[in-house]
Amino acid sequence: VADPDEPCDPSWGGAYSLDDAARDLELDRRITQLRAAGGDIMVSFGGQANSELAFVCTDDADLASAYRSVVERYDLHAIDLDIENADIADTPSIERRARAVATVQAERAAAGDELDVWLTLPASRSGLTDDGVALVTATIDGGVDLTGVNLMTMNFGSADEPTSDMLAATKAALEAAVGQVADIYRGQGVALADSERWTKLGATPMIGQNDVIGEVFTLDDAKALAVVPADKP
């Protein structure tokens, strides 16, 4: 997220600069160790708290530089853009973000390094919200080669009407979203094959008790959800 005092400087949670995280959290060393053991990382920008960079950094060049500094420091091959709250309907920041990320992605491609880009967005049992559909469309329009859309499959109901079957609600959200994503690409002149549609989707449930009382996503739900893509064409 953005540094609270310097809106075009990336930070970890608004509390640590990249250098601070290397010194105080030994983050760079830990990443090196993980990769030496065969693992890798993906950095997610944004989230429920604080300010995503594009929402407060209004200069295109400075915004691209902010994303670039994170991608290059950690030699990232994939990033996630977790867009929530008012950001999801804020057209200026959506368009700025797309331009900046597209710039960095193109630079990486020119250097022979792929940069996968995911969007993480709120969802209901009907799939993406209207704002979510518009955001995905605008991101692609802005030049981003989008790897996929990750649905936040959680908190489906309300205090008065909690969702009793969280697995069914999650599956319904994904079934709806796969059609929405296919429609978005069709509008771009790209016809996704059935085998491609599900590769464009991810899901992030809230394991256990959700924020809505009465909604619990169990370990059995998680096991069942893990095999859903395998059941699709």
Regions found by a protein language model. Give the residues of each.
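Short, low-complexity, polybasic intrinsically disordered segments
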Residues: 215-233
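Chitinase-like catalytic core of GlcNAc-active glycosidases
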Residues: 1-188, 192, 196-218
